[in-house]
C-alpha cells in the first residue's frame, strides 16, 4: 500500500476508510448491530494503532497511547481488525473470520457503488469539507486498500 499511496498518512487514511466500510458490511452479513463488532487499524505486531483524530486524519499511536508522526521510522504494515465486541464474545469472531473474502468484496462494492465523490458516512465514514475543497478523496484511498485486499487470495492471508 505504501508504494501505491503517496504517503503513509494517505495510506493510513485509506486503511481507516476501508475498515469503516468492512465493519458495516460485516455487521450486515453477520446480521448483527455495528456495536456488536469492533474495528481497529494497527500494526500486526502490536507496535502501533490508528485512530481518527479531531482533524479528521488518521493518527498513529504507540501502545502507551502517545502520538507517532506518520513518518515514524518503524515498520509500517497496517492491518484491519474486526472482532466480537462483547466481553467473552457472543460467537461472531469465528464465522466472521470465515467470511473475510465476502466482507472485503462487499466493502469494495459498497464504496465503488456509492454515489458520493470524496466519501461519506454511507461508505468510508464522515469526510471533512476541507477534503472536498482540496480534492482529497478518502473514498479513493479506501478503494485502493480494498482493491489490494481483494486482489490477494484468501489462502495468502494470515491464519489464526
For the regions a language model picked out, list residue spans one by one:
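Extended, highly charged accessory segments
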Residues: 3-160
Amino acid at each position: 500500500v505504501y508504494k501505491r499511496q503517496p504517503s503513509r498518512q494517505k495510506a493510513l487514511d485509506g486503511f481507516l476508510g476501508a475498515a469503516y466500510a468492512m465493519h458495516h458490511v460485516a455487521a450486515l452479513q453477520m446480521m448483527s448491530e455495528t456495536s456488536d463488532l469492533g474495528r481497529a487499524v494497527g500494526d500486526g505486531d502490536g507496535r502501533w494503532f490508528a485512530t481518527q483524530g479531531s482533524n479528521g486524519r488518521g493518527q498513529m499511536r504507540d501502545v502507551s497511547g502517545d502520538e507517532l508522526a506518520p513518518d515514524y521510522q518503524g515498520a509500517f504494515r497496517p492491518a484491519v481488525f474486526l472482532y466480537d465486541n462483547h466481553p467473552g464474545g457472543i460467537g461472531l469472531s469465528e464465522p466472521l473470520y470465515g467470511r473475510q473474502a465476502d466482507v472485503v468484496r462487499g466493502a469494495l462494492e459498497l464504496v465503488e457503488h456509492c454515489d458520493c465523490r470524496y466519501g461519506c458516512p454511507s461508505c468510508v465514514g464522515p469526510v471533512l469539507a476541507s477534503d472536498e475543497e482540496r480534492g482529497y478523496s478518502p473514498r479513493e484511498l479506501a478503494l485502493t486498500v480494498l482493491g489490494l485486499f481483494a486482489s490477494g487470495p484468501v489462502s495468502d492471508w494470515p491464519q489464526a
